[in-house]
Amino acid sequence: MKKFVFSVCALFAAATISFAQDVNEATDYFNAAVEYLNLGDKATALENFQKAYDIAKECGEAGQALVDQCESTIPQLALMVAKDYVKAGDYETAVAKAKEAAAIAAAMNADASVAEAEALIPNIYMQQGNTLLKAKDYAGAIKAYAENVAINPSNGKAYVNMAACYDKLGQTDKAEENYLLAAANGQEKAANKALGNIYLKKALAANKAKNFDQAIELANKSISFNETSKAHYIIGLAAQNSNKLDIAITAFEKYLELDPTASNAQDVRTVVDALKKAKK
């Protein structure tokens, strides 16, 4: 019986010594993490804080103070690491680190940090898209914007930019589709202006190809999104060339109303007068 009691005491003593050693090891990792953080090496600091945390959690009450300190530090530090990758332009790694930060924060019940990390992810995709758009990598930008709206489907600005990329690639159907989504999500003014320009270009091309009825139709479509003097002028030209005098007169007069100081204003007035005389 005495031997058994002795053995149990020895076991508790060994456990106490083990816990003390583990807490010391956790403390060493924690202190190393602080040093790395002071040196600006956030990634290595995070690794050491995580090691300190994992060890301290196994030490029960003896490691609780370290656990608390780690839990108040690690979630925000993980976010800072992700943001550093954003600043460096390494967007793929930034997204991976932001997802990792969200998972870490969730495991530590740091709800505010979870929300911040999750909100960061679509912003990273948006910034990536903007960077690629500026670099004229339109296909890459479309991919990034698509990732953004998959998470945040009400981001009208992403649809505007994605539509602009499709337009640059000559995919006007896709451009129109995304401009309409942009208009439905708070970007109506920018989207309608862009849609007006798309149909204005189509109307110009149709008029140049002597497809006058199509030119009139497309110019009217342009006006339905964004009224411009140029669209009315194209209608006037196409209608004049297809002997639709009433339409031509109305369109040219609207052109002069919208742009009375146009360089060709006097010539257009002369044409209008001639068309009116031709009707008599």
Where are these regions (language model features)?
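Short coil turns that delineate tetratricopeptide repeat
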Residues: 23, 57, 106, 153, ...
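Helix-start (N-cap) detector for alpha-helical repeat units in TPR-like alpha-solenoids
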Residues: 26, 60, 68, 75, ...
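Register position in tetratricopeptide repeats
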Residues: 38, 76, 80, 87, ...
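Canonical positions in the second alpha-helix
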Residues: 52, 101, 148, 181-182, ...
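Canonical tetratricopeptide repeat
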Residues: 65-69, 73, 80, 120, ...
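Alpha-helical adaptor scaffolds
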Residues: 122, 184-224
